[in-house]
Amino acid sequence: MTELKAKGPRAPHVAGGPPSPEVGSPLLCRPAAGPFPGSQTSDTLPEVSAIPISLDGLLFPRPCQGQDPSNEKTQDQQSLSDVEGAYSRAEATRGAGGSSSSPPEKDSGLLDSVLDTLLAPSGPGQSQPSPPACEVTSSWCLFGPELPEDPPAAPATQGVLSPLMSRSGCKAGDSSGTAAAHKVLPRGLSPSRQLLLPASGSPHWSGAPVKPSPQPAAVEVEEEDGSESEESAGPLLKGKPRALGGAAAGGGAAAVPPGAAAGGVALVPKEDSRFSAPRVALVEQDAPMAPGRSPLATTMMDFIHVPILPLNHALLAARTRQLLEDESYDGGAGAASAFAPPRSSPSASSTPVAVGDFPDCAYPPDAEPKDDAYPLYSDFQPPALKIKEEEEGAEASARSPRSYLVAGANPAAFPDFPLGPPPPLPPRAPPSRPGEAAVTAAPASASVSSASSSGSTLECILYKAEGAPPQQGPFAPPPCKAPGASGCLLPRDGLPSTSASAAAAGAAPALYPALGLSGLPQLGYQATVLKEGLPQVYPPYLNYLRPDSEASQSPQYSFESLPQKICLICGDEASGCHYGVLTCGSCKVFFKRAMEGQHNYLCAGRNDCIVDKIRRKNCPACRLRKCCQAGMVLGGRKFKKFNKVRVVRALDAVALPQPVGIPNESQALSQRFSFSPGQDIQLIPPLINLLMSIEPDVIYAGHDNTKPDTSSSLLTSLNQLGERQLLSVVKWSKSLPGFRNLHIDDQITLIQYSWMSLMVFGLGWRSYKHVSGQMLYFAPDLILNEQRMKESSFYSLCLTMWQIPQEFVKLQVSQEEFLCMKVLLLLNTIPLEGLRSQTQFEEMRSSYIRELIKAIGLRQKGVVSSSQRFYQLTKLLDNLHDLVKQLHLYCLNTFIQSRALSVEFPEMMSEVIAAQLPKILAGMVKPLLFHKK
């Protein structure tokens, strides 16, 4: 019978035999040249005469080039038929898709003997000569010093097999495609003693002959069986304990996959909790070994089939030694579950690393494996693989759920030990699979484990970081969070997207309460504006929008901000700020009745009567004069916005003795309408002169008066006139002082909201000036008398508009007053959410209110009459809101039925009507009122 003789790890494949696992495997890493004693003498294993060739590259270092090992010929050779039989059984097992729960009977003896060999204590007399120096120098010494060449100087506790993998459940190649029942070494063993397997009665560096046999897959206790074969995408492995399918010897055993009839053994030691040494995984290759193949392919560390780039040996050794010597480092003791793997850190460099074990919360459980999913052990790993990022150190209790992508290679993570300071990382691309949207760390006792939710574009969710600040090092917090900061102040969009992490990982939302800056509520119009009265957005106009009970609570006029809590009129105890002045309730009621009743009080003395708590009812004339001098304005509760200096000046005026004689009316009016120190009334304010200069010219409607009026022709002419007036309003507003300082969107909004008010107000002014309010003077070529109004289809609407010129006639409105009121009409309606240039808008409106007061003072020569005049004019402005609402409703109905009514609407006017009138009629705008209804 032909026998197969193995000539080392580079032995070619024999036809008809099992395929050599080394052939065709990608070049992943350098071979681990640790002294893994895998040969067993005939005394130790009488029934087994060969060691699997799959362990040859791991257990025995490759000889130097040109060196022919003397023990190349085997003493006990295994027949090819046995190898083929073992291979056929492995094929049958894999084809059946099942997994053996216990090793075959033939292998049980081998397992026991191997365990006896592995677990036997190493005596001083068992040290044997080490392999040649070339083998030692070519090894990878990542977790300890190189083995000395001197045999006596090599203690049994110095193992050099580099455990590079933390996830050992890999493809089994020709063996069973599942992770078989397995056992592990005791956790009490240190990593070095676990890796070194001293053979009782056999040399450490024995050159015993070997025979090829199928390589077993190295498995681990935390991997599930039933993982799919290499042809399909298997589910993500969970870190769960599995029942051991064999007798445990001494608390640990070596894993023996089914199909390894030749006694192939792959040992995967469990790491000690006191150390951070990762675990080793051996992967079986599928193709025969080609002649001349580098020995690097003989040992295939499963790096999820990611090409391995060179590693800095000195850096790895130094970092590993630092972690091993660190007494405060805890290798996963703080994990919530006893089976949770130790904490891992992301590899931020472009060097390839192995995928560490992820806890159960890292991935959402899949009901069934999906073919289109990205398994951890597929030939291609997409960018969707996340790397959990976590701060190292005993004090690091807050972990970051954000993950990043390794630059230059498919992402992976070194388990349990971080590399040196990494270069900056680019943000990870959004995940392509929702289930893999985030990888969170196992929750520690004082840490927060969650995943950030999807970002949203509108809000900055700040999260409050719990726990101690992370230490400075290679895994410092991301740039958006300063070390030790209490929260991330950057928008969520700037962070990597982990949209499905909150739901998939089962994160508790209570762990991340959304906070604002400095404990304040989150900014935004929806949170601060949409309240009745809009107190947050329009502080200058709170007096017009809120009742006295609310106005008395203004922080600017709280009692704490005033020097005294007395009435500025009579000296009694003040009850609040009424009509802009701190007064008592009696003076408040007196002033309101005196102004609304339009009483003409006369002083029996010389207008210098003493007004105090006892004698305040003796002379109502002097009491009213004193109210006006203090600054009380009926309906002008807005004027309590005057600063504290103004109030102190009023207090000083009350404290000083009144001058003897009748005070000058102009001085009293100046004291009443002075809004800033040194600003007195002028004869013609320059702003009013400017308003006169920019007033639009007369606009014609283009109506044909020779033809009889019809409903459609009259409405069409009015629409044409409205289009021209709308263009005139736009041109006029651009020349208006202060209007161009507003945001362009605010300018458009104000014009669209107020164009109807401006048109009907201009109609009333023209009707008042040209025809004394007897007719509706739309344009020089379109004047409707009462008869034409009755013949029209909108007679009731004409009566409504006719009220404005009649009111002008009653009040005898001056041009200066009209110009100031016209500007205030432009600024009397705003959106509910406010304007973008809210501050500039408030300043502009306040300035034109002052101009209106100046315009009133040009003709009114008395304080009482001026206050009454201001009340009447502002009341007219408030009444225009209801009148214009009727016009809006009629205009919208006509626009909707324009085809049926044969009424034409110009283009610009149609756009404004369609876009804004439904919103205005639905109450989605906020009118600014001077008086409470």
Curated annotation (Swiss-Prot):
Sequence segments annotated as region (AF1): 456-546
Pro residues biased stretches: 418-433
Motif (Nuclear localization signal): 183-187
Disulfide links within the chain: none
Keywords, in A-Z order: Cytoplasm, DNA-binding, Isopeptide bond, Lipid-binding, Lipoprotein, Metal-binding, Nucleus, Palmitate, Phosphoprotein, Receptor, Steroid-binding, Transcription, Transcription regulation, Ubl conjugation, Zinc, Zinc-finger
Region (AF2) location: 687-933
Molecular function terms, GO-annotated: nuclear steroid receptor activity; sequence-specific double-stranded DNA binding; steroid binding; zinc ion binding
Ubl conjugation listed as a keyword: yes
Region listing for Mediates transcriptional transrepression, in residue ranges: 165-305
Region (Disordered), start-end ranges: 1-256, 331-378, 415-452
Phosphoserine: modified positions: S20, S81, S130, S162, S190, S213, S294, S345, S400, S676
Cross-link (Glycyl lysine isopeptide (Lys-Gly) (interchain with G-Cter in ubiquitin)): K388
Glycyl lysine isopeptide (Lys-Gly) (interchain with G-Cter in SUMO) crosslink, residue number(s): K388, K531
PANTHER family in the cross-refs: KNIRPS-RELATED PROTEIN-RELATED
Swiss-Prot/TrEMBL domain comment: Composed of three domains: a modulating N-terminal domain, a DNA-binding domain and a C-terminal ligand-binding domain.
Name recorded for this polypeptide: Progesterone receptor
Lineage: Eukaryota, Metazoa, Chordata, Craniata, Vertebrata
